[in-house]
Amino acid sequence: MVIGTYISIITLNVNRLNAPSKRHRLAEWIQKQDPYTCCLQETHFRPRNTYRLKLRGGKKIFHAIGNQKKAGVAMLISDKIDFKIKNVTRDKEGHYIMIKGTTQEENIAIITIYAPNIGAPQYIRQLLTAVKEEIDSNTIIVGDFNTSLIPIDRSSKMKINKETEALNDTIDQIDLIDIYRT
């Protein structure tokens, strides 16, 4: 990535945004942090409620939501980054959204994921396999994977199961780097 300046990205599991007071506190906090991009997981919006997430100033808001009041992800992109959107891909259950575009003449893709509580490693592995042709060195993947990928993230002596090992193999094959673990 040869972007002349930095790109600030915040990712948060918001654990439901149905309460107005929580939405207002979140909006104020995001305004104060002033990131270029903010990725939210577990918004729990229904299709008719996405308008409830509002921010002052120039922010484009994209949602991936299911029919039930669970899961849900959102991505907020500031106008100050001059991000030209080329493509938005999302699933119907509200577990991921991928936005591809350009900034400073560089192609960039941002994916935010909220993996289901049950079968998270398998879900993420299938998703990464499905979008691997879209992933390159200018792809940023954030979110709540609902699984511990390495032993340091696990309590006591819990072992990594076969599904997580398969996910780690997929991550290695696609050549993804966990910036928090390098």
Region spans (language model):
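A shared catalytic/ligand-binding motif for oxyanion handling
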Residues: M1-T182
